[in-house]
Amino acid sequence: MTKSLPGVADLRLGANHPRMWTRRVQGTVVNVGVKVLPWIPTPAKRILSAGRSVIIDGNTLDPTLQLMLSTSRIFGVDGLAVDDDIVASRAHMRAICEAMPGPQIHVDVTDLSIPGPAGEIPARHYRPSGGGATPLLVFYHGGGWTLGDLDTHDALCRLTCRDADIQVLSIDYRLAPEHPAPAAVEDAYAAFVWAHEHASDEFGALPGRVAVGGDSAGGNLSAVVCQLARDKARYEGGPTPVLQWLLYPRTDFTAQTRSMGLFGNGFLLTKRDIDWFHTQYLRDSDVDPADPRLSPLLAESLSGLAPALIAVAGFDPLRDEGESYAKALRAAGTAVDLRYLGSLTHGFLNLFQLGGGSAAGTNELISALRAHLSRV
């Protein structure tokens, strides 16, 4: 007779345990789990996931992600927002990223501050160890405009710098709810303009070869920066990015898509997370959800924008609006390279150290970024 582990049922959300103790157990599970996962053979991952593949909408979920998600749910971890608590949610995301296994990726790293519309903006610059002039990517981290920082995306920026052979400038823009919309947009645009002006003299990067990119909320900010830069260049003059690298971006705050219904629970980013992020970002803000500064898909014109390299994940509630943005850009005459990672979930780029599909997908997107920037 098969027995379940003693006490597992009691660890589910809703059990009568002190909240802090439950969070501590969840944190331990995350730390241990992510270190063990890369060493488990794929057939064993299937067995540990009850021997069943998850197939939705014609896509089969990556076995590594399937095991991670199923194990997390057993211990009450589902989604990024923790008990509607900003501090706990930020700590949760930071803990996941810090727990990732593997050696540190060695590139030259410098912390700095750059001028912004409301004061200095913390930033981190990454340079390939070989030196030499390269393109520069201005990177905006994900986290629902509410979570995340320079450290949560440090490993991804290091990997991008090394494997794309480019310089990366990661921007620690202001977060909600302390700084509601459009604070993040203002910081993101100011950072791009500053980076473009100082790419050569400050970093030794190739002048005029500055791209923008980011994951999730950072992809949203990248798309918005491209539109703002285009409009400024048309009417006032100013720099524009040479490429936009949009990684499972949020593009329409008003959307109620099919993928939102299919993947709104159980696939890392939940519908509840999305709603909570929107509440934080728009709290005390007078910006309408349909404003292009929030919803770049709803901009009056999508012509004249930088070429786009867009990634969508098959098990992501944001999948459909990412595809819709790619389609709309193409219809407006913008060059688009759309990469569909069917077996993956939202957030897989922060999980590349787990191996499996997350590593393969991340490598594909960084290789594509390198190829695109070599041609602009």
Swiss-Prot record:
Mind telling me what this protein is named? Answer: Carboxylic ester hydrolase LipN
Q: What is the effect of changing H346A?
A: Loss of activity
Say which domain of life the source belongs to: Bacteria
What does the similarity note say? Belongs to the 'GDXG' lipolytic enzyme family.
Task: Please give the function described in this protein's UniProt entry.
Answer: Non specific carboxylic ester hydrolase. Hydrolyzes various pNP-esters, with a preference for short carbon chain substrates. Can also hydrolyze tributyrin to di- and monobutyrin and 4-hydroxyphenylacetate to hydroquinone.
Name the UniProt key words of this record, in alphabetical order. Answer: Cytoplasm, Hydrolase
Q: What is the effect of changing S216A?
A: Loss of activity
Which residues does the entry assign to the active site, renumbered to this chain? S216, D316, H346
Q: Per the UniProt entry, what species is this protein from, by scientific name?
A: Mycobacterium tuberculosis (strain ATCC 25618 / H37Rv)
Coiled-coil stretches = none
Enzyme class at the top of the EC tree: hydrolase
Q: How does activity depend on temperature?
A: Optimum temperature is 45 degrees Celsius (with pNP-butyrate as substrate).
**Pfam families in the record, alphabetically?**
Abhydrolase_3
Control of this protein's activity is summarized as: Completely inhibited by tetrahydrolipstatin (THL), RHC-80267 and N-bromosuccinimide.
Cross-referenced SUPFAM superfamilies: alpha/beta-Hydrolases
Q: Which GO terms describe its cellular component?
A: cytoplasm; plasma membrane
What causes induction of this gene? Expressed in macrophages after 6 hours of infection. In vitro, expressed only in acidic stress conditions.
Q: How does activity depend on pH?
A: Optimum pH is 8.0. Stable between pH 6.0-9.0 (with pNP-butyrate as substrate).
Q: Which compartments does it reside in?
A: Cytoplasm
Q: Which GO terms describe its molecular function?
A: acetylesterase activity; carboxylesterase activity; short-chain carboxylesterase activity
Catalytic reaction list = a carboxylic ester + H2O = an alcohol + a carboxylate + H(+); an acetyl ester + H2O = an aliphatic alcohol + acetate + H(+); a butanoate ester + H2O = an aliphatic alcohol + butanoate + H(+); an octanoate ester + H2O = an aliphatic alcohol + octanoate + H(+)
EC numbers listed for it are 3.1.1.-
